[in-house]
């Protein structure tokens, strides 16, 4: 546990609550002190939904600490069972309330005797895993619970659907453009002649989980949530799964090919002409292939970019920038430290360096050092970009309200390629735009940022040196500032004056 004013992935209980509140008619009870119960406010603020967040906080206060939690927790479970009539009540502690080391499983067993609902305790180690790992584990736990329950109650043989069908696992609340991606995935599968069997957890019902094994395969669009459930279904029911994220033209094609291979292995009469479909979608429906050959996109060739986000989105955007748009990715990184090996393997050869960290100050210093033409990251990278005057396109959670758009903006599938192309192109400062603004927009009043974003900088700029720096055109100012600071460090100077600026200029032969 550490104190931070910014976290990329939240504590474990947030992941459990995100999964629980994505299902229909599932209620979550959070055993937590005041201060840990911000999930309701966060979800109500960000998600474009009319429903109340189905989460109740069972507050740990001084009375609970004096008498124990059993009475209060059981009372909250039975009360919500009578008030809401949910199909499932899931109890989760937080990392703070876990310190009490209470036997919550015993509380759940006791409450389950008097409840019509199913009651389970989230099986998550709150000290070892983060929000995304906990969400993945909770989804797998709920699916396992209901499938084992159905198996114990019925011995009927499993029957697959007549037509090719798929489950989509991992679409859930507060995800990055998850609702839009889900619509695009439905369209893609429908085009391939594949029926949607179940979508979990978003909008799904736990009473239908026993229908999951009827599908021919599972589609996992995001690595962060759904892989554990897919592996469980593969091991127990021999269900294949596709974990290629269909983001960008090449990976969408790879995803379609994997789906077709799975369907053909089960049904030899399936003769969908996917080659023609891919060709038509790539050439006429998606504008990305045409755009990447246009003069507008060619102007971006060789420009430097930095990518940072969750493993799925950061890896996919890195490959799109490098393979499909010819943009140089100076650094690609992720905050999913638990998936570092997979991430390195995916971006190998597509970027100059890789950064695996959940410390935003390291990301900020890396961006300040590289000075890219554009950043593609999370809400935090947007803030960093504003401080450094570098444009940023948001490509990954965590994000704020402006990245929960009302309009249709998927990142997956062929429509997603159009959205990504727009985002990439609009994120770069175009041509002479910056210079023309200085010429026709009066004096350049932008403050020159002279420090790195961490607190360990050892250089200061004299006022006259800053004034001279502001006279330099914007498109070379950053390079000159960087060279001057490098020269000052070599000469062990803590204050950069005009004399040092001119000496640095002579030293680099300018």
From Swiss-Prot:
InterPro entries reported for this sequence: ChlB/BchB/BchZ, LI-POR_suB-like_C, Nase/OxRdtase_comp1, P-CP_red_C, Protochl_reductB, Protochlorophyllide_Rdtase
PANTHER family: LIGHT-INDEPENDENT PROTOCHLOROPHYLLIDE REDUCTASE SUBUNIT B
Iron in keyword set: yes
Annotated [4Fe-4S] cluster binding sites: 36
HAMAP family listed in its UniProt record: ChlB_BchB
Pfam families: Oxidored_nitro, PCP_red
Cofactor binding mode and count: Binds 1 [4Fe-4S] cluster per heterodimer. The cluster is bound at the heterodimer interface by residues from both subunits.
Sequence positions that bind substrate: 431-432
Annotated EC: 1.3.7.7
Source species: Chlorella vulgaris (Green alga)
Function as written in the Swiss-Prot or TrEMBL entry: Component of the dark-operative protochlorophyllide reductase (DPOR) that uses Mg-ATP and reduced ferredoxin to reduce ring D of protochlorophyllide (Pchlide) to form chlorophyllide a (Chlide). This reaction is light-independent. The NB-protein (ChlN-ChlB) is the catalytic component of the complex.
Active site (record annotation): 296
SUPFAM superfamilies associated with the record: Helical backbone' metal receptor
Co-factor(s): [4Fe-4S] cluster
Subunit structure and binding partners: Protochlorophyllide reductase is composed of three subunits; ChlL, ChlN and ChlB. Forms a heterotetramer of two ChlB and two ChlN subunits.
Example of a GO biological process term: photosynthesis, dark reaction
Enzyme class: oxidoreductase
Keywords: 4Fe-4S, ATP-binding, Chlorophyll biosynthesis, Chloroplast, Iron, Iron-sulfur, Metal-binding, Nucleotide-binding, Oxidoreductase, Photosynthesis, Plastid
Subcellular localization, as worded in the UniProt entry: Plastid, Chloroplast
Listed GO MF terms: 4 iron, 4 sulfur cluster binding; ATP binding; metal ion binding; oxidoreductase activity, acting on iron-sulfur proteins as donors; oxidoreductase activity, acting on the CH-CH group of donors, iron-sulfur protein as acceptor
Keyword Plastid tagged: yes
GO cellular component, one term: chloroplast
Pathway(s) this gene product operates in, as recorded in its UniProt entry: Porphyrin-containing compound metabolism; chlorophyll biosynthesis (light-independent)
Protein name: Light-independent protochlorophyllide reductase subunit B
Gene this chain is encoded by: chlB
Substrates-to-products reaction catalysed: chlorophyllide a + oxidized 2[4Fe-4S]-[ferredoxin] + 2 ADP + 2 phosphate = protochlorophyllide a + reduced 2[4Fe-4S]-[ferredoxin] + 2 ATP + 2 H2O
Protein family per UniProt: Belongs to the ChlB/BchB/BchZ family.
